[in-house]
Regions:
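C-terminal nucleotide
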Residues: 2-13, 17-20, 27-83, 96-99, ...
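Residues at or immediately flanking beta-strands
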Residues: 84-88
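Short acidic, glycine/Ser/Thr-rich loop/turn "cap" segments at secondary-structure junctions
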Residues: 91-104, 118
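DPxDG-like acidic metal-binding loop motif
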Residues: 103-125, 158
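Short glycine/threonine-rich catalytic loop with a Thr-x-Gly-x-Asp
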Residues: 104-106, 288-295
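Short hydrophobic alpha-helical segments that form membrane-spanning helices or hydrophobic packing faces
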Residues: 115, 299-300
């Protein structure tokens, strides 16, 4: 039996803009894990604790994402001369509580998890680029129009600067060419680890809301113009530079700017709870913003001294915002859940 795991992710900056090829986003891995156990079996058995039953490879709508991942990895392994054999795959870790998702990128986590499990089962090594391409190929074949930023972060398990690629072009190639040929091509993305040169606490607050409306989606599409994209790219690049050079004030300014850019896209991104989460950092050596799609789910904060961290956590608790995760970055004591 082999055990593998994948993490979740949250955006620090660049969400929405990253949907446009060539744009930048800064994304942080969150060690809230999904796990998979895989072992040899007489027949295929796939189980996820999202559901109350298991399946084989016969199409099942609930298990479609997992089954399609298995199919693509088997296609890849066949090109590598691997003899396929049946297995039992057991997936656990729903990244939700009381039926409400945390918004940590669980579909991306599932795809990467299945790929890692199968490659481990067949004792095949894969670097970050291959994992990213395989997982992205699964989602592109499904018609997923996401940026693949969650995949970039999940395969890295770190704080990463991601530059997006032309997904339409690669999806077209996947329709026309053999998988192996497409995997061998240059896709035009980049993934780089970012190491901050300053000390701070990173906190994740969960609002327990999910409220992405069609009105919000339309507003965002209408407002994602050239000016927004240029501002977003400059903000992310300056944020990364400030983190690497240890410039606390610039980090705060750039995250504030990233937050304002999101507000300019749609008034619905900041729900009342997310606005409270953000404004709780008033008078503190800290900065907070919505993370990801907005309209609910999670917000993040960076706090630059212990008193600010303590006060921010207290304010969040009083507002009914749950501290989902806390990590001490640049400290000797790395994290606390």
């Amino acid at each position: 039996m082999t055990l593998v795991k994948t993490c979740g992710k949250l955006y620090w900056a660049g969400e929405y803009a990253i949907l446009v090829p060539g744009q930048l986003a800064l994304i942080k891995a969150i060690p809230i894990y999904m796990t998979a156990e895989i072992k040899a079996s007489d027949g295929y058995r796939l189980y996820s604790d999202m559901f109350t039953y298991s399946v084989d490879l016969r199409p099942d709508s609930s298990y479609a994402l997992i089954q399609e991942t298995v199919a693509l990895v088997e296609e890849y392994l066949t090109t590598q001369g691997v003899d396929l054999r049946p297995f039992s795959l057991d997936i656990r870790g729903k990244m939700e509580r009381e039926g409400k998702k945390f918004g940590l990128g669980s579909s991306g986590s599932v795809v990467v998890l299945v790929i890692k499990a199968m490659l481990a089962f067949y004792e095949r090594l894969a670097d970050r680029e291959l994992l990213f391409k395989l997982a992205s190929a699964v989602l592109l074949k499904r018609g997923d129009n996401g940026s693949m930023g969650d995949i970039a972060c999940i395969v890295s398990e770190d704080l990463v600067l991601y530059q997006s690629f032309d997904r339409e072009k690669v999806a077209h190639l996947l329709e026309k060419e053999e998988l192996q040929a497409v995997l061998g091509r240059e896709w035009g993305f980049s993934i780089a680890n970012v190491e901050p040169a300053l000390e701070f606490d990173f906190l994740v607050g969960w609002t327990k809301e999910v409220a992405v409306s069609s009105h919000m989606v339309k507003q965002i599409k209408d407002n994602m113009n050239a000016s927004f994209l240029q501002s977003s790219e400059e903000t992310v690049a300056n944020l990364v530079k400030a983190l690497q050079m240890g410039q606390e004030e610039t980090v705060i300014d750039m995250l504030e700017q990233a937050s304002q850019l999101l507000e300019g896209l749609s008034s619905d991104i900041y729900t009342p709870s997310l606005r409270q989460l953000k404004e709780a950092r008033q008078d503190l050596r800290a900065v907070a913003k919505s993370s990801g799609a907005g309209g609910g789910d999670c917000g993040i904060a960076l706090s630059f001294d212990q008193d600010s961290t303590t006060l921010l956590k207290k304010r969040w608790a009083n507002l009914g915002i749950e501290l989902l995760y806390q990590e001490r970055i640049g400290h000797d004591d790395e994290s606390e859940g």
